[in-house]
């Protein structure tokens, strides 16, 4: 196997990579050198492909696609590291954005043009970034676990992702998520949950959304955690509390600017481990994990400091 592996989602951004591959391939090979190119065929493929690449001895694994593809690839790498005797990541992670949302590109300060992003990967020295592990309940009711590199949340955000992923993304990232958020606002009922941050006493709160943030943006440009940094060794925990419909609609004009703190029912805290469960065990509170909806509460979010080496 080549020491560098490129995992491409050919369907990202309306099939951009697939349509432009004859032009993109020589440019990418020129920038990245000898590289093993692999194409995903369906959602979720990036995780086992990245895991296999790390286990086969790759030095660099690059995700090319949207935020979901990047999260899949990072998750596969983290799974490989977890199954290894090594205490540090053995392989670097790179990202070439072809995104609907583009949140991860903002957080990692990745150039928006593919040629520039590839050049950055080729020149940059790896730097450690944090990740998160999540243990939760899958849609089939069975315990599951996974990883995230940006934001994992619960509440209306899970419904928004469900609406985004079942519909068309032809409007582009920000508009797609904004329309889905409006639709969800009129359908969602605030959930009563119990929250524990690290070893602090648990508390109950009715939530519109509760976000455990490693990065600062989610939902196609929503600035959910303005103080969050992907390499600071701690989660930012943002609670959008028991918002009324009017407050929820007002939130839409604030959150893209990171000004949701102007609402009295919004709070922000710090933690390295977060446990959230529904007060009513029969209530299904959906999760949003890096833009996907893998399941529901209860969930435990655990920080993995410096778990990935990022090049770009």
Give the positions of each predicted feature.
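ATP/NTP phosphate-donor binding region
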Residues: 1-64, 71, 115
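Short N-terminal binding/cap micro-motifs at the start of the first secondary-structure element
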Residues: 13-17, 219, 310
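Short amphipathic alpha-helical segments
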Residues: 18-20, 74-77, 106-108, 223-224
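Catalytic core of DAGKc-family lipid kinases
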Residues: 31, 55, 78-208
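Short glycine/serine/threonine-rich phosphate/pyrophosphate-binding segments
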Residues: 46, 68-73, 103, 129
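Glycine-rich phosphate/pyrophosphate-binding beta-alpha loops
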Residues: 153, 157, 211-225, 292-293
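ATP/nucleoside-binding phosphotransfer catalytic cores, i.e., glycine-rich phosphate-binding loops
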Residues: 197-199, 204, 223-224, 229-230, ...
